[in-house]
């Protein structure tokens, strides 16, 4: 089979800038989708508890709660062959499957207000929401 990667080279760093705003597509970040007993999984892997909407996180490893028993772990990887049932949870590698966009600048919260129905001053236990018509985790 032909190697089609030569037809579609990886894009360079993509950024949009405006008054008080910079939106940047970041390079792929290691990610895992975890479903199951989240507290047990977090303890076994040295992760802090998953956070909800607009919560501050500690880099490089953190978890975003998406539903009662589902989270997205950022900054951690599992080999595809080793994925599956691990420490009381179903684990799926997601690196490269979900784009990571950084929205920065003094007008960043105005973008959130226009692109979603969230109250940017509030928080929610789930980081999942519709953002500009696309399912996202903030």
Language model features: what each stretch is:
Residues 1-138:
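Basic, glycine/lysine-rich polyanion-binding surfaces/domains
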């Amino acid at each position: 089979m032909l190697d089609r990667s030569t037809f579609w080279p990886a894009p360079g760093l993509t950024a949009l800038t405006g008054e008080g705003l910079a939106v940047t597509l970041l390079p792929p970040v290691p990610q895992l989708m975890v479903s199951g007993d989240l507290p047990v999984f977090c303890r076994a892997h040295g992760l802090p508890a998953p956070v909800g909407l607009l919560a501050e996180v500690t880099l490089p490893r953190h978890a975003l709660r998406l539903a009662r028993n589902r989270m997205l772990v950022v900054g951690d990887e599992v080999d595809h062959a080793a994925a599956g049932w691990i420490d009381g949870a179903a684990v799926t590698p997601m690196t490269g499957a979900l784009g990571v966009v950084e929205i920065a600048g003094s007008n960043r919260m105005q973008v959130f207000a226009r692109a979603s129905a969230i109250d940017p001053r509030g928080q929610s236990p789930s980081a999942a929401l519709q953002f500009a018509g696309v399912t996202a985790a903030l």
